[in-house]
Amino acid sequence: MWKMREFEEKLYKENLYKIAGLDEVGRGCWAGPLVVAICVLKKDYNNKLIKDSKKMSSKNRKLVFEQLNREALLIDWIIYDAEFVDKTNPKKTSIIGMEYLINKHKDKIDYCLIDSEKVENVLVKTQSIIKGDQKSISIASASIVAKVVRDDIMNQLDKKYPLYGFSKNKGYGTKHHIEALAKYGPINKIHRFSYKPIKNLLLNKKE
């Protein structure tokens, strides 16, 4: 048995075939949105390119995203901007997004596999899997969808705000990003002002 399909194979034996994988991307970023995605694959779907999106090249992620668009039974995502993440907190934002997507598509799902998080306000049975994007093809597929969608947004933001290097750092706290923040300050509605590094930067500027 292919390890990336181990959880799915167990569910197939229980006559559960429409298995949704859910994951988020962008939780630890200092800038940009948080994206939550859902993906339902056909039974026994096989694509050896699929793995944890963080371990894939950008080219392969885009290729798999296009394949999933054509071949998956369902893919969908929801985008939460930096303001929402600031008001709600990143963990809760992830859970809200997962619950929304599960309930939106409840009639098309038999069971949900979720990366790390536990959800409660849903009408479908779920299972939380630690490091699920490394263990489940369904979760890994959702991770790829969320990553490609978010990277595209960050590439667009890079065109609007070229001084921050968003196309390269994707909103994470890289050396260049830190230097740009120190020089130009955070961008309203783009940076996450509730995050400690941004808070500290603003405090230092006041002193």
Each language-model region and where it sits:
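RNase H-like, Mg2+-dependent phosphodiesterase core
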Residues: 1-207
